[in-house]
Amino acid sequence: MAEKKQWHETLHDQFGQYFAVDNVLYHEKTDHQDLIIFENAAFGRVMALDGVVQTTERDEFIYHEMMTHVPLLAHGHAKHVLIIGGGDGAMLREVTRHKNVESITMVEIDAGVVSFCRQYLPNHNAGSYDDLRFKLVIDDGVNFVNQTSQTFDVIISDCTDPIGPGESLFTSAFYEGCKRCLNPGGIFVAQNGVCFLQQEEAIDSHRKLSHYFSDVGFYQAAIPTYYGGIMTFAWATDNDALRHLSTEIIQARFLASGLKCRYYNPAVHTAAFALPQYLQDALAPQPS
Protein backbone atom coordinates (compact mmCIF):
# COMPACT_ATOMS: atom_id res chain seq x y z
CA MET A 1 0.00 0.00 0.00
CA ALA A 2 1.39 3.40 -0.96
CA GLU A 3 2.22 5.68 1.94
CA LYS A 4 -0.12 8.64 2.23
CA LYS A 5 1.21 12.13 1.77
CA GLN A 6 1.49 14.13 4.98
CA TRP A 7 0.79 17.81 5.52
CA HIS A 8 2.74 19.40 8.38
CA GLU A 9 1.65 22.57 10.11
CA THR A 10 4.33 25.26 10.41
CA LEU A 11 2.94 27.42 13.23
CA HIS A 12 5.71 26.47 15.70
CA ASP A 13 9.35 25.81 14.89
CA GLN A 14 10.19 23.11 17.44
CA PHE A 15 7.10 20.90 17.30
CA GLY A 16 3.74 20.63 15.62
CA GLN A 17 1.04 18.43 14.17
CA TYR A 18 0.57 16.64 10.90
CA PHE A 19 -2.36 15.28 8.92
CA ALA A 20 -2.46 12.40 6.47
CA VAL A 21 -3.73 13.82 3.19
CA ASP A 22 -6.27 11.55 1.55
CA ASN A 23 -7.13 13.99 -1.22
CA VAL A 24 -6.24 17.59 -2.03
CA LEU A 25 -9.43 19.38 -3.01
CA TYR A 26 -8.06 22.87 -3.55
CA HIS A 27 -4.66 24.54 -3.41
CA GLU A 28 -3.97 27.98 -4.74
CA LYS A 29 -2.15 31.13 -3.75
CA THR A 30 -4.38 34.21 -3.84
CA ASP A 31 -3.24 37.82 -3.68
CA HIS A 32 -3.29 37.59 0.10
CA GLN A 33 -2.77 34.01 1.27
CA ASP A 34 -1.73 30.45 0.43
CA LEU A 35 -4.95 28.43 0.68
CA ILE A 36 -5.33 24.66 0.81
CA ILE A 37 -8.24 22.33 1.53
CA PHE A 38 -7.66 18.60 1.81
CA GLU A 39 -9.48 15.55 3.12
CA ASN A 40 -8.36 13.61 6.19
CA ALA A 41 -10.03 10.44 7.47
CA ALA A 42 -10.05 11.61 11.10
CA PHE A 43 -11.02 15.28 10.73
CA GLY A 44 -12.84 15.45 7.42
CA ARG A 45 -12.07 18.45 5.27
CA VAL A 46 -9.24 20.62 6.58
CA MET A 47 -8.53 24.20 5.55
CA ALA A 48 -5.14 25.80 6.13
CA LEU A 49 -3.84 29.28 5.39
CA ASP A 50 -0.11 29.91 5.07
CA GLY A 51 0.76 26.57 6.65
CA VAL A 52 -1.53 26.93 9.66
CA VAL A 53 -4.77 24.98 10.25
CA GLN A 54 -7.76 27.30 10.29
CA THR A 55 -10.68 24.90 10.48
CA THR A 56 -11.70 21.27 10.14
CA GLU A 57 -15.10 19.71 9.64
CA ARG A 58 -14.68 17.52 12.72
CA ASP A 59 -14.12 20.12 15.43
CA GLU A 60 -15.11 23.51 14.00
CA PHE A 61 -18.38 23.50 15.93
CA ILE A 62 -16.56 24.07 19.23
CA TYR A 63 -14.81 27.22 18.07
CA HIS A 64 -17.80 28.72 16.28
CA GLU A 65 -20.37 27.97 18.98
CA MET A 66 -18.17 29.55 21.65
CA MET A 67 -17.27 32.59 19.58
CA THR A 68 -20.93 33.25 18.79
CA HIS A 69 -23.24 32.11 21.57
CA VAL A 70 -21.17 33.40 24.49
CA PRO A 71 -21.33 37.09 23.44
CA LEU A 72 -24.83 36.93 21.95
CA LEU A 73 -26.44 35.30 24.96
CA ALA A 74 -24.45 37.45 27.37
CA HIS A 75 -25.70 40.54 25.55
CA GLY A 76 -29.26 39.29 25.63
CA HIS A 77 -30.83 41.47 22.93
CA ALA A 78 -28.29 41.94 20.15
CA LYS A 79 -29.89 43.15 16.92
CA HIS A 80 -26.90 44.00 14.75
CA VAL A 81 -23.83 41.76 14.52
CA LEU A 82 -20.51 42.35 12.75
CA ILE A 83 -18.20 39.48 11.81
CA ILE A 84 -14.65 40.36 10.80
CA GLY A 85 -13.18 37.53 8.73
CA GLY A 86 -15.14 34.31 8.89
CA GLY A 87 -15.03 33.61 5.18
CA ASP A 88 -15.71 29.91 5.70
CA GLY A 89 -19.26 30.84 6.75
CA ALA A 90 -19.45 28.84 9.99
CA MET A 91 -19.53 31.91 12.24
CA LEU A 92 -22.31 33.29 10.08
CA ARG A 93 -24.13 29.96 10.36
CA GLU A 94 -24.13 30.18 14.15
CA VAL A 95 -25.19 33.85 14.23
CA THR A 96 -28.14 33.17 11.92
CA ARG A 97 -29.48 30.71 14.50
CA HIS A 98 -30.32 33.72 16.70
CA LYS A 99 -33.72 34.79 15.38
CA ASN A 100 -33.71 38.11 17.25
CA VAL A 101 -30.70 39.31 15.25
CA GLU A 102 -31.86 41.69 12.52
CA SER A 103 -28.69 42.27 10.50
CA ILE A 104 -25.40 40.42 10.06
CA THR A 105 -22.51 42.13 8.31
CA MET A 106 -19.41 40.12 7.43
CA VAL A 107 -16.20 41.84 6.37
CA GLU A 108 -13.72 39.57 4.60
CA ILE A 109 -10.51 40.86 3.04
CA ASP A 110 -10.27 38.05 0.49
CA ALA A 111 -13.19 37.26 -1.80
CA GLY A 112 -11.37 34.09 -2.82
CA VAL A 113 -11.79 32.63 0.66
CA VAL A 114 -15.55 33.04 0.49
CA SER A 115 -15.93 31.58 -2.98
CA PHE A 116 -13.86 28.46 -2.47
CA CYS A 117 -15.27 27.80 1.00
CA ARG A 118 -18.78 27.88 -0.42
CA GLN A 119 -17.67 25.20 -2.85
CA TYR A 120 -15.36 23.06 -0.73
CA LEU A 121 -16.66 23.55 2.84
CA PRO A 122 -20.43 23.63 2.30
CA ASN A 123 -21.15 22.15 5.74
CA HIS A 124 -19.52 25.18 7.35
CA ASN A 125 -21.96 27.75 5.99
CA ALA A 126 -24.90 25.30 5.73
CA GLY A 127 -26.78 27.71 3.48
CA SER A 128 -26.34 30.72 5.76
CA TYR A 129 -24.98 32.90 2.94
CA ASP A 130 -28.55 32.96 1.63
CA ASP A 131 -29.96 34.40 4.86
CA LEU A 132 -31.76 37.66 4.06
CA ARG A 133 -30.22 39.37 7.09
CA PHE A 134 -26.69 38.82 5.76
CA LYS A 135 -24.50 41.34 3.94
CA LEU A 136 -20.97 40.58 2.71
CA VAL A 137 -18.42 43.38 2.46
CA ILE A 138 -15.04 42.75 0.81
CA ASP A 139 -12.73 45.13 2.64
CA ASP A 140 -9.89 45.34 5.10
CA GLY A 141 -11.28 44.94 8.61
CA VAL A 142 -9.33 47.85 10.08
CA ASN A 143 -10.50 50.17 7.33
CA PHE A 144 -14.12 49.08 7.71
CA VAL A 145 -14.45 49.60 11.46
CA ASN A 146 -12.81 53.01 11.20
CA GLN A 147 -14.89 54.21 8.25
CA THR A 148 -18.35 52.64 8.53
CA SER A 149 -21.37 54.64 9.64
CA GLN A 150 -23.04 51.46 10.92
CA THR A 151 -23.06 50.49 14.58
CA PHE A 152 -23.27 47.02 16.09
CA ASP A 153 -24.25 45.29 19.31
CA VAL A 154 -21.74 42.44 19.00
CA ILE A 155 -18.49 42.34 17.01
CA ILE A 156 -16.83 38.96 16.41
CA SER A 157 -13.27 39.06 15.10
CA ASP A 158 -12.70 35.67 13.47
CA CYS A 159 -9.09 36.54 12.76
CA THR A 160 -6.13 34.39 11.84
CA ASP A 161 -2.96 34.47 13.95
CA PRO A 162 -1.19 37.87 14.17
CA ILE A 163 1.10 37.20 11.23
CA GLY A 164 0.63 38.19 7.60
CA PRO A 165 -2.81 39.57 6.68
CA GLY A 166 -4.21 38.79 10.13
CA GLU A 167 -1.70 40.95 11.97
CA SER A 168 -3.71 44.15 11.50
CA LEU A 169 -6.64 42.66 13.46
CA PHE A 170 -4.52 42.69 16.63
CA THR A 171 -3.58 46.38 16.44
CA SER A 172 -4.74 49.36 18.47
CA ALA A 173 -6.13 50.89 15.27
CA PHE A 174 -8.46 47.91 14.88
CA TYR A 175 -9.54 47.83 18.52
CA GLU A 176 -10.17 51.58 18.50
CA GLY A 177 -12.29 51.22 15.37
CA CYS A 178 -14.30 48.42 16.94
CA LYS A 179 -14.98 50.58 19.98
CA ARG A 180 -16.03 53.38 17.63
CA CYS A 181 -18.75 51.33 15.89
CA LEU A 182 -19.92 49.32 18.91
CA ASN A 183 -23.20 50.39 20.49
CA PRO A 184 -23.29 51.23 24.22
CA GLY A 185 -23.21 48.00 26.19
CA GLY A 186 -21.94 46.11 23.16
CA ILE A 187 -19.46 43.24 23.25
CA PHE A 188 -16.30 42.61 21.23
CA VAL A 189 -14.76 39.12 21.05
CA ALA A 190 -11.78 37.75 19.13
CA GLN A 191 -9.80 34.56 18.93
CA ASN A 192 -6.53 34.97 20.79
CA GLY A 193 -4.61 31.77 20.25
CA VAL A 194 -3.64 28.92 22.57
CA CYS A 195 -2.48 30.76 25.67
CA PHE A 196 0.08 28.18 26.85
CA LEU A 197 2.00 28.60 23.60
CA GLN A 198 0.96 32.12 22.59
CA GLN A 199 0.77 33.89 25.93
CA GLU A 200 2.29 37.09 24.61
CA GLU A 201 -0.67 37.47 22.25
CA ALA A 202 -3.06 37.47 25.20
CA ILE A 203 -0.93 39.93 27.15
CA ASP A 204 -0.65 42.26 24.15
CA SER A 205 -4.38 42.12 23.36
CA HIS A 206 -5.31 42.71 27.00
CA ARG A 207 -3.06 45.75 27.20
CA LYS A 208 -4.34 47.29 23.97
CA LEU A 209 -8.02 46.57 24.56
CA SER A 210 -7.81 48.06 28.05
CA HIS A 211 -7.19 51.46 26.46
CA TYR A 212 -10.66 51.40 24.89
CA PHE A 213 -12.87 49.22 27.10
CA SER A 214 -13.48 49.25 30.85
CA ASP A 215 -13.98 45.48 31.13
CA VAL A 216 -11.43 43.30 29.33
CA GLY A 217 -10.91 39.61 29.90
CA PHE A 218 -10.78 36.21 28.25
CA TYR A 219 -12.81 33.05 28.08
CA GLN A 220 -11.68 29.65 26.85
CA ALA A 221 -12.45 26.37 25.11
CA ALA A 222 -10.46 23.27 24.18
CA ILE A 223 -10.34 22.67 20.42
CA PRO A 224 -8.38 19.58 19.32
CA THR A 225 -6.73 20.91 16.17
CA TYR A 226 -5.73 24.16 17.89
CA TYR A 227 -3.34 22.07 19.93
CA GLY A 228 -1.35 22.98 23.01
CA GLY A 229 -4.11 23.40 25.59
CA ILE A 230 -7.04 25.76 25.88
CA MET A 231 -7.75 28.40 23.29
CA THR A 232 -8.48 31.86 24.61
CA PHE A 233 -10.98 34.37 23.25
CA ALA A 234 -10.59 38.06 24.01
CA TRP A 235 -13.63 39.74 25.56
CA ALA A 236 -14.13 43.50 25.76
CA THR A 237 -17.10 45.65 26.77
CA ASP A 238 -17.99 48.65 28.90
CA ASN A 239 -20.64 46.69 30.79
CA ASP A 240 -18.73 44.60 33.31
CA ALA A 241 -21.92 42.85 34.48
CA LEU A 242 -22.15 40.89 31.24
CA ARG A 243 -19.09 38.78 32.03
CA HIS A 244 -20.51 37.79 35.42
CA LEU A 245 -24.09 36.81 34.59
CA SER A 246 -25.38 33.84 36.54
CA THR A 247 -25.83 30.46 34.91
CA GLU A 248 -29.56 30.82 35.63
CA ILE A 249 -29.82 33.98 33.53
CA ILE A 250 -27.87 32.41 30.67
CA GLN A 251 -30.01 29.27 30.98
CA ALA A 252 -33.21 31.29 30.61
CA ARG A 253 -31.89 33.06 27.52
CA PHE A 254 -30.60 29.81 26.07
CA LEU A 255 -33.96 28.08 26.47
CA ALA A 256 -35.78 31.06 24.98
CA SER A 257 -33.45 31.05 21.97
CA GLY A 258 -34.31 27.48 21.02
CA LEU A 259 -30.66 26.75 20.30
CA LYS A 260 -29.45 23.15 20.12
CA CYS A 261 -25.69 23.00 20.45
CA ARG A 262 -23.03 20.29 20.42
CA TYR A 263 -20.50 22.00 22.73
CA TYR A 264 -21.99 25.18 24.16
CA ASN A 265 -24.40 25.09 27.09
CA PRO A 266 -25.09 27.57 29.92
CA ALA A 267 -22.80 25.78 32.39
CA VAL A 268 -19.96 25.80 29.86
CA HIS A 269 -20.67 29.50 29.26
CA THR A 270 -20.08 30.56 32.86
CA ALA A 271 -17.21 28.10 33.39
CA ALA A 272 -15.39 29.37 30.30
CA PHE A 273 -14.45 32.60 32.09
CA ALA A 274 -12.43 30.65 34.68
CA LEU A 275 -8.80 30.98 33.58
CA PRO A 276 -5.68 29.06 34.65
CA GLN A 277 -3.50 30.74 37.23
CA TYR A 278 -0.53 31.16 34.89
CA LEU A 279 -2.66 33.28 32.57
CA GLN A 280 -4.16 35.28 35.44
CA ASP A 281 -0.65 35.97 36.71
CA ALA A 282 0.52 37.02 33.24
CA LEU A 283 -2.37 39.47 32.88
CA ALA A 284 -2.09 40.93 36.38
CA PRO A 285 -0.74 44.50 36.67
CA GLN A 286 3.01 44.39 37.10
CA PRO A 287 4.56 46.29 40.02
CA SER A 288 6.27 49.46 38.90
From Swiss-Prot:
Residue ranges occupied by any PABS domain in the UniProt entry: 9-238
GO cellular component: cytosol
Superkingdom classification of source: Bacteria
Keywords carried by this UniProt record: Cytoplasm, Polyamine biosynthesis, Spermidine biosynthesis, Transferase
EC id: 2.5.1.16
BP-aspect Gene Ontology terms: spermidine biosynthetic process
Protein name: Polyamine aminopropyltransferase
Organism: Shigella dysenteriae serotype 1 (strain Sd197)
Lineage: Bacteria, Pseudomonadati, Pseudomonadota, Gammaproteobacteria, Enterobacterales
Gene label: speE
